[in-house]
């Protein structure tokens, strides 16, 4: 297995692109399949065992909701 370097990327998408990615994620979750997504040139394979959560942050007049998917590689 290759040793991957640390990475922290935030990518903006149009509403249509974001909806498409969420729809593919929902379809994968419902069917019990792994989810694949390409972000900034790297293909990411999200395993079925991943943990999903939603985070809400507020600071001053700015608010943020993050849909998070977490897992550990073996």
Range-by-range predicted roles:
Residues 2-30:
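N-terminal acidic leader/helix
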Residues 2-8, 34-38, 42-74:
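N-terminal intrinsically disordered, cationic/polar leader segments
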């Amino acid at each position: 297995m290759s040793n991957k370097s640390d990475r922290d990327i935030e990518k903006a998408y149009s509403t249509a692109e974001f909806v498409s990615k969420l729809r593919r994620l929902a379809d994968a979750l419902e069917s019990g399949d792994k989810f694949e997504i390409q972000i900034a040139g790297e293909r990411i394979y999200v395993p079925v065992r991943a943990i999903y959560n939603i985070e809400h942050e507020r600071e001053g007049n700015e608010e943020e909701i993050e849909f998070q998917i977490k897992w550990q590689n073996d």
